[in-house]
Amino acid sequence: MEPLNRTEVSEFFLKGFSGYPALEHLLFPLCSAMYLVTLLGNTAIMAVSVLDIHLHTPVYFFLGNLSTLDICYTPTFVPLMLVHLLSSRKTISFAVCAIQMCLSLSTGSTECLLLAITAYDRYLAICQPLRYHVLMSHRLCVLLMGAAWVLCLLKSVTEMVISMRLPFCGHHVVSHFTCKILAVLKLACGNTSVSEDFLLAGSILLLPVPLAFICLSYLLILATILRVPSAARCCKAFSTCLAHLAVVLLFYGTIIFMYLKPKSKEAHISDEVFTVLYAMVTTMLNPTIYSLRNKEVKEAARKVWGRSRASR
């Protein structure tokens, strides 16, 4: 056998959409607009939930955290992706690749848990209305979100360290437009079983388990709604649950496709398309589906905007 050509890695080449120049020219204005809408929408929701005292409730605390996650997640890859769409040199340093991998894993994992926590909050609000404020106290909200942030960060750092310490051989071309951990692992010439097993275990804990919890919560909510005598109230509550469930299905469905699908040695353009869908469309739609259609949020936004104009 020939010895493995191990080299010290200083940078990676992100293949991305290199083979599709027409697609690159189309994606740049589209992704730029989506990125701007994502930042503006989520920043507005986060600001309103903090500045308006009437929104200092558990549901808007979690919505504020969701907006914070979306604001933290998209800058981990979108600005560099936009630069690469216009550039012929699509490289990323080893250190930046590791940071990008860690932050994207951490924020994505935290959002998985946040969606489950939000489903539990919806269940308590609809199914246990008299005990809601006792069961879902502010202290519990902070503890749940703090635990989610810390645990997912530790998990992501561990996955990144295990993966990036592997030896890399031959070309350093990542068949993706970001440093996705599965794409980087394909370049490793060492034993990747430990990293893959750790990643699979984390995927199972953060995908099927929370998703099953969310589905159970919504089934209990639906059963409660069907017992509500008022048809108008029933329809309103049911439509709200459908909106939340739509985002959950979009978010979890794309992740499950990317991480739990059968392995393939060749990269497919569908990976990139689904990653854009998961990473950008969901973060852009979250403010609209979760908050901007809510009358309380609209009223709070008008009050905050009015106070800001009056103070000038």
UniProtKB/Swiss-Prot annotation:
Positions annotated as glycosylated: 5, 191
Gene3D superfamilies (UniProt xref): Rhodopsin 7-helix transmembrane proteins (1.20.1070.10)
Membrane-protein topology: Multi-pass membrane protein
Cellular localization per UniProt: Cell membrane
GO MF: G protein-coupled receptor activity; olfactory receptor activity
Main location group: membrane
Stretches in topological domain Cytoplasmic: 47-54, 121-139, 218-237, 293-312
GO terms for cellular component: plasma membrane
Cystine residue pairs: 97-189
Segments crossing the lipid bilayer: 26-46, 55-75, 100-120, 140-160, 198-217, 238-258, 272-292
Lineage top rank: taxon: Eukaryota
Gene Ontology biological process terms, A to Z: detection of chemical stimulus involved in sensory perception of smell
Keywords of the record: Cell membrane, Disulfide bond, G-protein coupled receptor, Glycoprotein, Membrane, Olfaction, Receptor, Sensory transduction, Transducer, Transmembrane, Transmembrane helix
Disulfide bond recorded as keyword: yes
InterPro entries: GPCR_Rhodpsn, GPCR_Rhodpsn_7TM, Olfact_rcpt
Membrane topology (Extracellular): 1-25, 76-99, 161-197, 259-271
Any matching Pfam family: 7tm_4
Recorded family membership: Belongs to the G-protein coupled receptor 1 family.
Physiological role: Odorant receptor.
Protein's recorded name: Olfactory receptor 13J1
Species of origin: Homo sapiens (Human)
High-level lineage: Eukaryota, Metazoa, Chordata, Craniata, Vertebrata
